[in-house]
């Protein structure tokens, strides 16, 4: 696996810039559209061991965005021992699609990773879905929304992740919530807040108090409903921070949210305290 990754890395680096990726793989084809994910592996992986996986979905309102958004977070977490995946999905600006197709793709990505867990050296029972804004919606909805499955997927493979890390996620698509004008009457089955149920995966919810899209009161209500059904939801509020505060360009809060992610994953037993890695 690692030899293959290095060969692919060398090939792609000779042709164009791919950030931190060690491998770029197609995971889905719809008509003439191919969707890809980048894989970032920990160093010195042992064949006899399996590793947690973290799947990142970029933000952009299901309209714009790029899978490179979380490459710095993925690079750090790979050094900590997690196999990280940066996932493409269909968006309106490129594919003239709706948010419903975006969610279908997110579920396809989780299924693909779980199905091929042994090939990538991962534990299929330790898959963490993560994302920011609309990407946070997709991460949460893979766990909570029971519809919006691609008919060509292998539907007996679960798309439900084992944990969630949500960066100012869109979690309310109901009337008054983000995206309602596009989701419309489908919101009861599409909106994560409206689909919380027993067994929902443990969740880390990171939010700035000055977020103009995700009200703090909505996040607090989400946490309350999660706890009511017996699921863990750690809500961390960052004073005076706006929407998108966690991105790499806002380095102080990039570091803080990465450390919070590390601490959360340690608490689940997905990471050990060592090796210590500088967040940079």
Where are these regions (language model features)?
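Short amphipathic alpha-helix adjacent to the substrate-entry channel of hydrolases
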Residues: 67-86
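Alpha/beta-hydrolase active-site loop
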Residues: 97-118, 257-259
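N-terminal cap/lid segment of alpha/beta-hydrolase-fold proteins
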Residues: 20-49
């Amino acid at each position: 696996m690692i030899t293959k990754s290095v060969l692919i890395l060398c090939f792609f680096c000779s042709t164009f810039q791919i950030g931190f990726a060690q491998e770029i793989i197609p995971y889905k084809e719809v008509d003439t559209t191919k969707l890809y994910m980048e894989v970032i592996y920990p160093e010195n992986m042992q064949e006899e061991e399996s590793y947690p996986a973290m799947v990142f979905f970029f933000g952009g309102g299901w309209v714009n965005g790029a899978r490179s958004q979380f490459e710095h977070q993925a690079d750090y977490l790979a050094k900590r021992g997690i196999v990280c995946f940066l996932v493409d999905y269909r968006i309106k600006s490129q594919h003239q699609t709706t948010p419903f197709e975006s969610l279908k793709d997110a579920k396809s990505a989780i299924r693909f990773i779980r199905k091929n867990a042994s090939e990538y050296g991962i534990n299929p029972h330790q898959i963490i879905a993560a994302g920011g804004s609309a990407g946070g919606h997709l991460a949460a909805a893979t766990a909570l929304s029971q519809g919006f499955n691609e008919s060509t997927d292998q539907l007996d493979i679960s798309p439900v992740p084992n944990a969630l890390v949500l960066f100012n996620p869109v979690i309310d698509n109901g009337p008054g919530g983000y995206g309602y004008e596009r989701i419309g009457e489908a919101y009861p089955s599409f909106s994560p807040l409206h689909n919380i149920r027993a067994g929902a995966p443990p969740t880390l919810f990171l939010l700035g108090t000055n977020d103009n899209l995700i009200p703090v009161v909505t996040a607090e209500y989400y946490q309350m409903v999660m706890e009511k059904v017996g699921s863990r939801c750690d809500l961390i509020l960052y004073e005076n921070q706006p929407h998108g505060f966690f991105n790499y360009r806002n380095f102080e809060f990039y570091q803080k949210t990465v450390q919070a992610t590390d601490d959360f994953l340690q608490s689940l037993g997905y990471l050990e305290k060592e090796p210590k890695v500088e967040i940079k």
